Amino acid sequence: VPSSLREACPPDYAHAQPGGSQTMKMIGRTVLITGGTSGIGLELAKQLTTRGNRVIVTGRRADRLEAARQAVPGLHTFESDVRDPASIEALYQTVSDRFPSLDTLVNNAGVMRNIKLDQSYRLDDLTAEIDGNLKGSIWMVQAFLPLLLRRQGSLIVNVSSGLAFVPFPAAPIYSASKAAMHAYTQCLRAQLDGKAVSIVELAPPATETPLFRDEFAEQMQGESAMNVSVLVKHAIAGIEAGKPEIRPGLSNVLKIASRVAPSFMLRQMVKLGRPKTSGA
């Protein structure tokens, strides 16, 4: 992305929207984070715990949940899979019984894959990102919303991506899932306008996480990404400022550029998705 375009945009930009969040302190809350054993989810758990919140994270692997507990003293963990409605229902029963004061849900679980659409895939495997990134978040909201609506000042944070605004052709299903998450979150915010629950969308840019670097190592060679600790600080500051959309760094550029130069931005993303070669 041209440096002139980066410099022309403020670091974080969001218009007030119907149902936008109220200013709130992220202190003394009970927070449930899906996909909290690594990357953004784990860093969010660390920072929120340090600020005096009671934090619960979910994940699919017992060994990673144990590692998260070791990394974050006082962390509560549950094995759960957002792709499985029965698993979500069981999680709801457990959390609502043990943590009836739950007032914050962070839909962070997800996967990002490099997919070539001219290759052969099993149909259910091809849409795995839709199941985890989109359907899982919708199901989590549907399951936990009745509990959250009982507490004034509750919060739902849906984690989308800067790619919700300009797709990354190397990750087509991921891009589609995050664009849909953006639309769903806007609708959820509008429908819950005036209710007890505020709706926030966090759209991270490329972020230094194992998921991102492992899957796109060739394409991202030499490219910069936001430090995950810095991203989470942006997220918490945005929530406390009452921003309905939090778009740190390049995500803000993508949102604005998608409106003023959509074709140009898509071409840039096509170039970015090509594997780097020596001497290039």
Regions found by a protein language model. Name each.
Residues V141, S177:
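Active-site helix of classical SDR
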Residues E201, A217-K255:
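C-terminal helical subdomain
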Residues E89, M112-T127, A170:
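Conserved mid-core segment of classical short-chain dehydrogenase/reductases
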Residues S80-L91, L123:
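The beta1-alpha1 cofactor-binding region of Rossmann-like NAD(H)/NADP(H)-dependent oxidoreductases
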Residues T30, T37-S38:
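Conserved glycine-rich cofactor-binding loop
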Residues R51-A67:
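Conserved glycine-rich Rossmann-like NAD(P)H-binding loop of the short-chain dehydrogenase/reductase
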Residues S161:
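Residue(s) in the substrate-gating loop at a strand-loop-helix junction
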